Each structure stands twice: as C-alpha cells, then as structure tokens.
Amino acid sequence: MKAYIYLENDIFLSAKAFGKSGTFFGELVFNTSLTGYQEIISDPSYAGQFIVFSMPEIGIVGTNENDNESKEIFASGVLMRELSSSFSNFRAKESLQDYLEKHGKIGIYELDTRYLVKMIRNNGNLRAVISTEISNKEDLKIALEKSAKIDEVNFVKEVSTKKNYSHKQGVWNASFQKFNDAKRSEKKVAVIDYGVKTNILNELVEVGFEVEVYPYNVKADELITLYKKGEIQGVFLSNGPGEPRILKQEIAEIKKLAEAKIPMLGICLGHQLLSNAFGYETYKMKFGQHGANHPVINLDTKTVEITAQNHNYNVPEELAQVAHITHRNLFGDNVEGVRYKDYPIISVQHHPESSSGPHESKYIFKEFMNLM
C-alpha cells in the first residue's frame, strides 16, 4: 500500500504504508528512544501527533497484551525507516502491523526518517497530512489547510476516562510474569485523568497508594470535600496531550485545589497546568523533547538522572518566583521540576514511571507520599 505525505512547509513525500488505510492529520514529532515503541505508540499524550522514530528499524519484538499505556491508540500515526519483516519475543502476541490495523492507525515505512528528524529539528514541529487515498500534492495541501490546528484542539476530553474507577494493579513483575497486586494502603490519591498512562497508575499503587481515577472535568469542590473528610490524602495531576493554555476550566479547578493546600503531584501536562494555575503561562518549544535518554540534574542532590520525556510545552523561568526549581534538563537547560513555596505541591516535566525508559526518577512517587 502506498501513502503520500504533505507537510505544511510544502514538502511532498511518498512511502509505503501498513495498518489502516485512509487520510490522517496531525503534527510531526520525533522520538529518539531505541526501545519501547509499544509504550510510546499507546501513550495518550501523542493524541493528534505523528510519531517519527529516529531508531532505524521498528517492530522486531512485536506487541503484547501488557505493555499498553492505554486501551486505545490516540496518535495519528507512526513513521519509521524500516519495518521489521518478522517479530520475535516470548511475550509477543501479534505484529506491529496487526496491532496498528486493529487500532485503526496508519504506519509508514521505507521513509528517510533521518531527513524528517533534521527537518523538524531545524523548522520545528510541522503539521502534516498522510493519505492512501489522495495522491495529488495540491489536493493534500488544501485538505491540510482545512484541518484543525493541534494547538486549538482539546484532546484531553477525548483521551480522559468518562467515569470514576479504581486502579488496583502494581508494576509488571518480570520474575512471575504478572502485575503485582495492590498493597494494603492507608493513603488514597485522586488521579485527575488528562490522559494518564497505565504505568503511572501502576507506580502509584506500587509505592503504596489506593488509587481512584477521575475524569478531567472533575470539580475541585468535590475533591476538596473528600480531602476534608479524610477520604483522600492527595491529588495527582496526570500527563496528557495538547496545548495546556486552552484548558481554562481545568486550570481554574487546579487553582482551587492549590488554595485548599491539598498535597499534589503533577507530571508532564499536570506540571504545566500547575504553572498556569499559579499565573505563569507555559510556552511551546521549537520541537519539544521526546525520548528516553534525556539527562536531568537534580539540583537538591547534585545528581544526574537519565529520564524519559514527551512534551512540546514547557514552564517559564519566572515560575521560580513562587516555586523552588528542583530539576533542570541538561539538553536545553529548561525547568524540569519544581517544589512550590508555601504549598505541599511538587511537579516534574519528565516521566518518572519510566515506561519506556530509565528508572532513576521513580523516587518522585515516594516524595509525593511524604507530602501527606
């Protein structure tokens, strides 16, 4: 199956396609991870984006039932240099081709991804249309111009749960080939789901929390009431997709939670929403940070952690007026983590659940528990 690709900078490409046929729109971002493609593809934070893998060959270990970060795939599609013609892993259940087709997503291969990565690095993230139906450049250009801009779409309401649920499994136990059972806990955390990854919930359970997940539009007053009754001891603000500044109501609710002095931890989008709630607007980066090899310095311990990253937006330096900066990214020197002054709130831009990625930042979940 052949596919045609048109980028907003007037670049027109063709390649081979697999998975779902059709016409797809999104923003190109590149990811530098060498492994963990299933976790990356199933991360809800990629909603509305085409993932360009810098790793030359993808698909060699297939896919399995336990490495998904969500039940659905919200990314617009996946682009790679080479697609592995076979897969081999004792946990694998199906090929990447079958996996994408089952989830209704397109995959692109036999494409010069090094060229694309350099283009994104030099020009910033680019809007794109990929089609197996339209082969004419001008028709694709018109279609892209008519499509919605990613910064104007509220993807959070698409990826969030529609109703409350309890999460009762811990992390994957490789020795026993199953997820750990939930521990008995005296501390309960309310997770606001802006697009939460399954392994973040697993880590919260593993560290000793009872976990209840709420939709993105849960009201602060409901959670404040639960906190005052002692039915929850903290609130977790999850990762998620899209432009944080358009989430006006969610930011207002977080401001109420902060004013109530409820212990909170924010990761990725949650980190950005907290900054906006305190009056310090986030900004869009040129091409973001996506990968599992990003060095971050912990300014409190003077140690360097290798972290997993997936974001296009960042908090401003001015946030230091209300928060102590705890972490910095050594690739870009941007703010990576903060501890708010006079509030029991911490947040980080990177992903301490490390799925996929290094395990060096998992202590942050214990720091969250220590706030309570």
From Swiss-Prot:
<feature type="binding site">
    <location>
        <position position="310"/>
    </location>
    <ligand>
        <name>L-glutamine</name>
    </ligand>
</feature>
<dbReference type="InterPro" id="IPR035686">
    <property type="entry name" value="CPSase_GATase1"/>
</dbReference>
<dbReference type="InterPro" id="IPR002474">
    <property type="entry name" value="CarbamoylP_synth_ssu_N"/>
</dbReference>
<feature type="binding site">
    <location>
        <position position="242"/>
    </location>
    <ligand>
        <name>L-glutamine</name>
    </ligand>
</feature>
<keyword id="KW-0028">Amino-acid biosynthesis</keyword>
<keyword id="KW-0067">ATP-binding</keyword>
<feature type="binding site">
    <location>
        <position position="272"/>
    </location>
    <ligand>
        <name>L-glutamine</name>
    </ligand>
</feature>
<comment type="subunit">
    <text>Composed of two chains; the small (or glutamine) chain promotes the hydrolysis of glutamine to ammonia, which is used by the large (or ammonia) chain to synthesize carbamoyl phosphate. Tetramer of heterodimers (alpha,beta)4.</text>
</comment>
<feature type="active site">
    <location>
        <position position="351"/>
    </location>
</feature>
<dbReference type="GO" id="GO:0006526">
    <property type="term" value="P:L-arginine biosynthetic process"/>
</dbReference>
<dbReference type="GO" id="GO:0004088">
    <property type="term" value="F:carbamoyl-phosphate synthase (glutamine-hydrolyzing) activity"/>
</dbReference>
<keyword id="KW-0436">Ligase</keyword>
<feature type="active site">
    <location>
        <position position="353"/>
    </location>
</feature>
<dbReference type="GO" id="GO:0006207">
    <property type="term" value="P:'de novo' pyrimidine nucleobase biosynthetic process"/>
</dbReference>
<dbReference type="Pfam" id="PF00988">
    <property type="entry name" value="CPSase_sm_chain"/>
</dbReference>
<feature type="binding site">
    <location>
        <position position="45"/>
    </location>
    <ligand>
        <name>L-glutamine</name>
    </ligand>
</feature>
<dbReference type="InterPro" id="IPR036480">
    <property type="entry name" value="CarbP_synth_ssu_N_sf"/>
</dbReference>
<feature type="active site" description="Nucleophile">
    <location>
        <position position="268"/>
    </location>
</feature>
<dbReference type="GO" id="GO:0006541">
    <property type="term" value="P:glutamine metabolic process"/>
</dbReference>
<keyword id="KW-0665">Pyrimidine biosynthesis</keyword>
<keyword id="KW-0547">Nucleotide-binding</keyword>
<comment type="function">
    <text>Small subunit of the glutamine-dependent carbamoyl phosphate synthetase (CPSase). CPSase catalyzes the formation of carbamoyl phosphate from the ammonia moiety of glutamine, carbonate, and phosphate donated by ATP, constituting the first step of 2 biosynthetic pathways, one leading to arginine and/or urea and the other to pyrimidine nucleotides. The small subunit (glutamine amidotransferase) binds and cleaves glutamine to supply the large subunit with the substrate ammonia.</text>
</comment>
<dbReference type="InterPro" id="IPR050472">
    <property type="entry name" value="Anth_synth/Amidotransfase"/>
</dbReference>
<feature type="domain" description="Glutamine amidotransferase type-1">
    <location>
        <begin position="188"/>
        <end position="372"/>
    </location>
</feature>
<feature type="binding site">
    <location>
        <position position="313"/>
    </location>
    <ligand>
        <name>L-glutamine</name>
    </ligand>
</feature>
<dbReference type="GO" id="GO:0005524">
    <property type="term" value="F:ATP binding"/>
</dbReference>
<feature type="binding site">
    <location>
        <position position="269"/>
    </location>
    <ligand>
        <name>L-glutamine</name>
    </ligand>
</feature>
<dbReference type="InterPro" id="IPR006274">
    <property type="entry name" value="CarbamoylP_synth_ssu"/>
</dbReference>
<comment type="pathway">
    <text>Amino-acid biosynthesis; L-arginine biosynthesis; carbamoyl phosphate from bicarbonate: step 1/1.</text>
</comment>
<keyword id="KW-0315">Glutamine amidotransferase</keyword>
<dbReference type="InterPro" id="IPR029062">
    <property type="entry name" value="Class_I_gatase-like"/>
</dbReference>
<feature type="binding site">
    <location>
        <position position="240"/>
    </location>
    <ligand>
        <name>L-glutamine</name>
    </ligand>
</feature>
<feature type="region of interest" description="CPSase">
    <location>
        <begin position="1"/>
        <end position="184"/>
    </location>
</feature>
<protein>
    <recommendedName>
        <fullName>Carbamoyl phosphate synthase small chain</fullName>
        <ecNumber>6.3.5.5</ecNumber>
    </recommendedName>
</protein>
<dbReference type="InterPro" id="IPR017926">
    <property type="entry name" value="GATASE"/>
</dbReference>
<dbReference type="Pfam" id="PF00117">
    <property type="entry name" value="GATase"/>
</dbReference>
<keyword id="KW-0055">Arginine biosynthesis</keyword>
<comment type="pathway">
    <text>Pyrimidine metabolism; UMP biosynthesis via de novo pathway; (S)-dihydroorotate from bicarbonate: step 1/3.</text>
</comment>
<comment type="similarity">
    <text>Belongs to the CarA family.</text>
</comment>
<dbReference type="GO" id="GO:0004359">
    <property type="term" value="F:glutaminase activity"/>
</dbReference>
<dbReference type="GO" id="GO:0044205">
    <property type="term" value="P:'de novo' UMP biosynthetic process"/>
</dbReference>
